[in-house]
Amino acid sequence: MLCWNEVQSCFLLAFLAVAAYSVSDAQGQVSPPTRLRYNVVNPDSVQISWKAPKGQFSGYKLLVTPSSGGKTNQLILQNTATKAIIQGLIPDQNYALQIIAFSDDKESKPAQGQFRIKDIERRKETSKSKVKDPEKTNASKPTPEGNLFTCKTPAIADIVILVDGSWSIGRFNFRLVRLFLENLVSAFNVGSEKTRVGLAQYSGDPRIEWHLNAYGTKDAVLDAVRNLPYKGGNTLTGLALTYILENSFKPEAGARPGVSKIGILITDGKSQDDVIPPAKNLRDAGIELFAIGVKNADINELKEIASEPDSTHVYNVADFNFMNSIVEGLTRTVCSRVEEQEKEIKGTIAASLGAPTDLVTSDITARGFRVSWTHSPGKVEKYRVVYYPTRGGQPEEVVVDGSSSTAVLKNLMSLTEYQIAVFAIYSNAASEGLRGTETTLALPMASDLKLYDVSHSSMRAKWNGVAGATGYMILYAPLTEGLAADEKEIKIGEASTELELDGLLPNTEYTVTVYAMFGEEASDPLTGQETTLPLSPPSNLKFSDVGHNSAKLTWDPASKNVKGYRIMYVKTDGTETNEVEVGPVSTHTLKSLTALTEYTVAIFSLYDEGQSEPLTGSFTTRKVPPPQHLEVDEASTDSFRVSWKPTSSDIAFYRLAWIPLDGGESEEVVLSGDADSYVIEGLLPNTEYEVSLLAVFDDETESEVVAVLGATIVGTTAIPTTVTTTTTTTATTPKPTIAVFRTGVRNLVIDDETTSSLRVVWDISDHNAQQFRVTYLTAKGDRAEEAIMVPGRQNTLLLQPLLPDTEYKVTITPIYADGEGVSVSAPGKTLPLSAPRNLRVSDEWYNRLRISWDAPPSPTMGYRIVYKSINVPGPALETFVGDDINTILILNLFSGTEYSVKVFASYSTGFSDALTGVAKTLYLGVTNLDTYQVRMTSLCAQWQLHRHATAYRVVIESLVDGKKQEVNLGGGVPRHCFFELMPGTEYKISVHAQLQEIEGPAVSIMETTLPFPTQPPTSPSTTLPPPTIPPAKEVCKAAKADLVFLVDGSWSIGDDNFNKIISFLYSTVGALDKIGPDGTQVAIIQFSDDPRTEFKLNAYKTKETLLEAIQQIAYKGGNTKTGKAIKHAREVLFTGEAGMRKGIPKVLVVITDGRSQDDVNKVSREMQLDGFSFFAIGVADADYSELVNIGSKPSERHVFFVDDFDAFTKIEDELITFVCETASATCPLVFKDGDKLAGFKMMEMFGLVEKEFSAIDGVSMEPGTFNVYPCYRLHKDALVSQPTKYLHPEGLPSDYTITFLFRILPDTPQEPFALWEILNEQYEPLVGVILDNGGKTLTFFNYDYKGDFQTVTFEGPEIRKIFYGSFHKLHVVISKTTAKIIIDCKEAGEKTINAAGNISSDGIEVLGRMVRSRGPRDNSAPLQLQMFDIVCATSWANRDKCCELPGLRDEENCPALPHACSCSEANKGPLGPPGPPGGPGVRGAKGHRGDPGPKGPDGPRGEIGVPGPQGPPGPQGPSGLSIQGLPGPPGEKGEKGDLGFPGLQGVPGASGSPGRDGAQGQRGLPGKDGPTGPQGPPGPVGIPGAPGVPGITGSQGPQGDVGAPGAPGPKGERGERGDLQSQAMVRAVARQVCEQLIQGHMARYNSILNQIPSQSVSTRTIAGPPGEPGRPGAPGPQGEQGSPGMQGFPGNPGQPGRPGERGLPGEKGDRGNPGVGTQGPRGPPGSTGPPGESRTGSPGPPGSPGPRGPAGHTGPPGSQGPAGPPGYCDPSSCAGYGMGGGYGEPTDQDIPVVQLPHNSYQIYDPEDLYDGEQQPYVVHGSYPLPSPYSQSSYPSPHLAQPEFTPVREEMEAVELRSPGISRFRRKIAKRSIKTLEHKRENAKEPSQ
């Protein structure tokens, strides 16, 4: 027996130790004692007994505390004790008892209870009469003894309990508060129609835990009490009292009129705000208040709060353990007050508490309605109208005076049902509500929509407005299916009801929708449809002045918007096609035509939007004219002169012949084409001769023969003769005289118009005219007529100078010797002084910009450019350039300045109107200029660096005496300090950013140095109270990270400043919410010479203990070794032993005041690359550049700098925000393309990386795009998967972008499969991307936030192209509202979705799974996957580039290709790749891969072997003509091409000259087949051609030495056997590659090597899917389609030449646009020409399987070697291209050579084709500039079209091998989630 006096010294001094007792981490691991009993042994002693717990423990701790607040007494007992006697007790005193079992550092939960000696004796006496044992108590359920009171009154009440949840209570005591609340609620009859209980918790901000109407049963309320969470924060009781008045005692919260209102406050301290007014407001509202104070509560404050009398309404206890002692008294008081209040309410108010009646609604509109009612009986003070939407929403209310019986409800939502309740408010109560519903009307919509003034690119919309509308929203989009981007939206104000819609597509039907807007709400739509006009073609084509080599075309103009015309004219026989573009004229003369030839002409109108349909017609040129006026004169006895008049300027030569009439030999002479006479000598005297003459023209056509008779004479008189033009040689009788006729001129033409001149041309009909008089007069007659005389042999005249843009009448009159002939007149008009067009600004820089324009249609003499600064005063400057220049680089401009630019066209008669525009240079200036460390004689300035600045000039100037200091700094220096300043002086600090020789404008700031110090007054010292636990910030509520602080503890800090760092850490960590494994874990390292771990990540699991540990950190001292500390954090703290967790953010915060004495860059950079986030805080003398190197990017979020340790408060909030945002991210940080992004590298997570893929069944590594990126082939049923909890343990974010780079294979099934999806544990899909190879659609699916399954499917031409066998880059952009698809960096569609819900992490994620699969026995589709990432942002798709795709790679903006090879090296190639693993040997234990052996020498060329089985196809060749496969679907409209004529007479159109970038054009003129054209140089990558002839294989090199037997290594990456290919074909392909490398087109042609889908080993392949029709390629010689051969390897392509004459048409291709016009007028159909170049080769025979090679010897065991280098240039790369290497090619000596069959599978990318136009001139802008630069220092533009020499020579055979796998085992396994979590280390090796 123990005496109380003996054990009294063992007890502790204060019961507060019990209240503050913190259960250890191990609590609960030791079982507690049970069956606690009491027995009185004498009047002051009690025996305590209990049942020992199970398990091992060391002893007991017994605690006894008097309820009156005395000492807590403690007793330690052995583990064998089960009884103890406590003496010296007071009989009528209550005692609290706790018994705890403990073992080492672990303690059990306490068995606890309360007792009083008198109560024990009373129960003992009672039990004797009832034969019961009242001493038994349940220690596990500490219900207060004797609290058996239950309120049984029928009266009901609304009780709201307000609980203090501030930090001062603590989590342990809050459990006691819950127990008190549970006992309190249990005393009342709780129910929805009985007493209702609500509860609010408060600290710094109150919150409703549940309303009065939240729970309908007592059990539900008690369950809510037991789960009440602890809030934490400050103590603002007044705010909380106001809060419950406004929120808890409301009808919508469950408060009932006519029911007692009770408020019970529980608090443990004095309020930090005023409580008197809020408490009075509650009491005035009829709410009876009870106040319960615990521990440190202010009794006076409690009395101010509670209702009277204080004796029954105020309770105060010394500790939380004694709260249950007041439950009975409190519940009895509340119960009696409820009964009394009910009597008062019923007795005094019941008669007057009638509710209003007869609820009526009226004046209903879309935004409100009126509510009316009949008055309530009695004296009503107010009426309260409560209303809210039936579908849910925040209730609102309107209060009106008691005399009113109506209220208007405003600002409601349209077409919404509202619940209405009207309450009568009396002086101390409210009536029941009068309830009803009403629905608002729909918003009024616009009406009478009219669409008019329709053109090809615009229309106007007009509608009737709506009263009350705040504006209108107009949506318009093409009616045809298109992209979401095609829809346009315009918002206008309420005053406008008419709008012009421009920028429309021609000949397109548009849907126009008008919404009336009422704020953010929109009315129902008003919709109309209208079709834009087609682009107007010209009309009324006429042909005139048709000669043998020219014809004049005339047509009526198309419209005022036409930019010009394109004229195509072709010979009907299809042998020649020509094309010319002219300006906006209506006439043009075709020249250099062929005589007697029919021509077909098509004229297209050219617009900015494209070209119109053609206007067509035809004409036939005339026969060539014979010479005219053949005469013989100047006859003598042996000669005479023959003269004639030429009839054309294109005569090549003449044949002149003569023969005597009486017989003799004929003689002939050939004369030049410019001859017009000849003297024939050596004739017989007095003899008549027949003289004949014919003209031979340039095109080798001959004219008719013209003949004349001439004779020699005896005398001296010349005999003139007349001329007879016949086809035979005839003569007329000579006449002695010449007849002269007064005829006018013929064919008067006025052409070559300029702004100041006209050319007049005519044919002379009579050579007897001596002169011609040319007169011209303006058509208006406002100028005097002028005349010019010209000789009779002249037939052309240039009239100048004339007025511009003026019509003239020109008249020609022949003048004869005896008078005038007949006059002929014609009109002509000079051109206007047209201004330049389309002013463009580009190449903006800090001191220059480029101006470009389009030339006007009128020929100019040059251009005058005038430019002037808009804001900076100064004169206007000007410059002149020639007429062949249309771009100019303006230099020496001011930075960041707007300039007005004017361009004038210069003509001989003056200048045109100005083409004006505004341009602005880039701003070269710093930002965020600020000052710091301002002292009496010094100050510092800092700024944000300019990204292009190379230096800074910083000037400080005194505003008092003007003294200056100036310094020049480097481009990376963001701050500078000035010294030797004057105290108390204002200074101006200016910073000029400099870029080379350019200096930007000054950025300035004013600052005043500190004045001389004065003696500050002394003040008494104060002692700061200990810091309280800070509340968690809202931004940190979701934070979950491993956070490590690295604190500088070097000597430079000092004790005082180190304490400030500790305070800063205390505040920063205090802002976090949950601490421990389920929240944020915190560790701290203090560093100087050596780092010291203050505590690890897993050291503390509560904020209280963590903050206490921070305060205990002691100052270290030493030097500054920051790099060593960072490395220590990585090696010691970021480990599993220290508590690091996977898949959550890892954050380091470095705090330092100086420069590190070791290297910090390397280790911080390495950790950042691994996903760690760094924050760097520099103080005072810290090195800013070092902080930037430590901190993550962007530095604005991760680097902080303060002047001193007192300035931490300036950055605290911002740092906490950024750290918590980083810690709250669902996604880890990864590095991608040099950017630090939040996301997931899914290829790594699935093991699809070079070091891991070999462990995955059914996966092989192959070369991807450019033959340098690795990609992975997922073979059939590979079913690559991983558990979701390893990949996305926190699920997916709400916004993210999925990125794939993949290729569909020929053996990919035609049924749907999931490219990637997440399944739950029942294998049900949750989210994923589905491709339907048969339907050519893409579908995204997930579950939305409501749990509904949702899918969006995309289709169309952009979607279909991903199924045609090329690599494509796919972005699936998912946001809370939309799903967007981007293919090859081009948007393909966007659709609306709901926000996603949560996903289960208990399932798996799978690649390629077939949709029809069910359960664990799944099937998967084969495909090639090169890239798979998920980036946690929707903006990534806009930032990402298609650098991995050959056709879209931009070398200037893309990183260099990995291991890109060059053809400029010597013929000898680099060291070969590592050798492959050997054949199967003796199976042994699992070993490592051996070291690669050296490359053996090349063996001699071998003989052609027996054809073997077909290998996988090799890399893709450039797009050529493929073997025709199955018919494809109708093609989409192509890019701009040449529109063809239908009919038999059509001919191929020629390529156009370089044109401007325009809209998509029409197809050119098809024509007849011509002769085979020469092969052109290589063109762009196109459709694969046919394979070449297989070459012969080389013999195997000598076998290496056999290594010692060893265990086989892990499964290697051996690929399938390669393919042998024709060396001639290979070399041709390689030469294309090399030449294009030289030409800068490496990106486009590297795809030759990679885009061939590999197939499993087979001797036969099936035809691939039909190819997608692409855009027309660059015009080149098009060859005829070859006959289909066997399917096989796509061979080397045809080599299209540079744009030139159009080649012959090929076989029928993809369906194009319909031709235009009607049947051609004339001409028989042409015959088909022979096939052109680039045709498919003949098929090779299928090979038979070769013999199996012998098994290799087992190699010696070795460590795993590094992966082999990527592909390299073959030694003959510049004459052929070796495609092997890099991935372990099989080198077995007995591998047979196989002959590849043809493959009809098309693999081409439509994006790789040219747009159907010649490439524009290349300049430094983004638009074509067909003119040279005006500055000599810049290169002239050149035509960027590839020119290659065809490869024709024979070359040696080269063996090609495609890396891949030659076998794999199809895996059929029941995959469970559990087995997927472990490595398949013992996977069976696949059979050979």
Curated annotation (Swiss-Prot):
Residues the record marks as carrying a glycan: 138, 1398
Subcellular location(s) of the protein: Secreted, Extracellular space, Extracellular matrix
Alphabetical list of CDD domains matching this protein: FN3, vWA_collagen_alphaI-XII-like
Superkingdom as given in the UniProt entry: Eukaryota
Statement: the UniProt record of this protein carries the keyword Mitochondrion: no
Biased composition (Low complexity): 1583-1593, 1677-1692, 1822-1837
Entry keyword set: Cell adhesion, Collagen, Disulfide bond, Extracellular matrix, Glycoprotein, Hydroxylation, Repeat, Secreted, Signal
Region called Triple-helical region 2 (COL1), residue ranges: 1664-1786
Name of the protein in its database record: Collagen alpha-1(XIV) chain
Keyword Glycoprotein: yes
Protein task: An adhesive role by integrating collagen bundles. It is probably associated with the surface of interstitial collagen fibrils via COL1. The COL2 domain may then serve as a rigid arm which sticks out from the fibril and protrudes the large N-terminal globular domain into the extracellular space, where it might interact with other matrix molecules or cell surface receptors.
Biased segments, Pro residues type: 1666-1675, 1739-1748
A cellular-component GO term for this protein: collagen trimer
Biased composition (Basic and acidic residues): 116-138, 1699-1711
Annotated organism of origin: Gallus gallus (Chicken)
Residue stretches making up the VWFA domain: 158-330, 1042-1215
Stretches the record annotates as Nonhelical region (NC4): 1227-1468
Entry-linked InterPro entries: Collagen, ConA-like_dom_sf, ECM_Assembly_Org, FN3_dom, FN3_sf, Ig-like_fold, TSPN-like_N, VWF_A
Signal peptide start-end: 1-28
Motif (Cell attachment site) on chain: 1489-1491, 1617-1619
Main location: secreted
Domain Collagen-like: 1468-1520, 1524-1579, 1580-1618, 1664-1715
GO BP annotations, alphabetical order: cell adhesion
